[in-house]
Structures are given as C-alpha cells and as structure tokens.
C-alpha cells in the first residue's frame, strides 16, 4: 500500500508540474509574442513620406527626410539581421539611435517624428528594427524584455563606431520597450554618451500583469509565466538588469 501511494504521489507531482509549465507556456505565448512584421497601417511609411495615422491630425511634412539609406546591421555573429534606416549629416555631430516599442517598428510615427526632428537639428540618425520586429530577422516571435534586444543596440553602436562615430557622440533615444532597452544597454556596453527615454516600463512584473489583464487573461498566471520563461526559455523577467547609476 505504501509503495503504491508513493508512486501515485510521484505521478501526481509530475503531472502537476507538467500542467503548471503547460499553463506557463500558453500564457507566455500569449503575453510575449510579437508579429515579426510591420503593422499594416504603417507599412508604407518611410522617412521621406509618412503619416501620423490616427495619432494626430496635423501635417508632419516639415519632418520628412528626403535622403536616407536602408542598411542592414548584423547582430549575434551575423545570425540576426537588423533592418535599419541611416541618415548621415555630419559625423562630427551627435548621432542618435532610435529604439521603438514592443510590436512596433521604425515605420511608426513614434520613431519617424523624432527622427525628423533630430535630422532638422543636424544630427545623424539611425533607426533600427529590433529582432522579431519590423523587417529584421524573425528569431522566434517573442520579445525578451530587453535581454536580447540590448544585443541589437550593441550591434548598432558597433556599426556606428566602424563608420568613425565617436562613442561620446552616440545617444540612445527609446520609447516604451525601446526606453527599457536603452536603460538596460549600459549593462552590456558603455560605448555611448547619453540616453533619453519616454515612458519606459521598469517594473516588468506589473507590465506583464497589465498586458495579461488587457488580453483577458487572469493575472495570477504571472507565476507560471515567470517560471516557464526562466526555466525553459532562459528569459529572466525580473533580473535587476537596469544598472544603478
């Protein structure tokens, strides 16, 4: 009787763990997946001609950029191709790397507007699509709360330095997830001079809970998401990766 009870308890424990991680896998897939594409309403945007869409109703044409270059930046030893837009004015002037939000891309007016503003100020500008976003390599269709995306920024910094841009003249500008990535980048590189962020999430647990509530999922699923991400996907959602300044 005792041996049967132990076998039953062991089986039940394995089943319980399997269900727990299965729930985590499903919820993680819902909360962290990204489309690996450009949003259809922004697909025709370019630095030389773009629309604000439903964000505003004024004419942004003063911030159009007539001359720009489409470039590919390699990350992860060439395994990741980052589709980017490069505008060179004067390499002795500041150069800004623009970082978009989650599920967004460089095609968004949230990137194109500041890109045009920086250009009008005589800055050089580089707008990248993170991996699994826009026209960059679709690695697995998930974002990693900045842990892999920071590698994309490091690759962009290296690309600029290869062009002769001084580290002290490189600035990071990020909004939403891009802001979080900018704040995390110093953990991997200090080859830049400044950071400006708009609305960055710094409490990822709260962010995931809010995203789950928005998608109609119960927020208590955060726990299996957290453990699935860390154990199976090696994405540690609450690591203190934003360095203290």
Model-found features: residue ranges?
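N-terminal membrane-anchoring alpha-helices
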Residues: 4-53
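N-terminal cap/lid segment of alpha/beta-hydrolase-fold proteins
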Residues: 53-89
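The serine-hydrolase catalytic nucleophile loop
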Residues: 104-116
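Alpha/beta-hydrolase active-site loop
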Residues: 143-163
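Conserved small/polar residues in nucleotide/adenosyl-binding loops
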Residues: 235-241
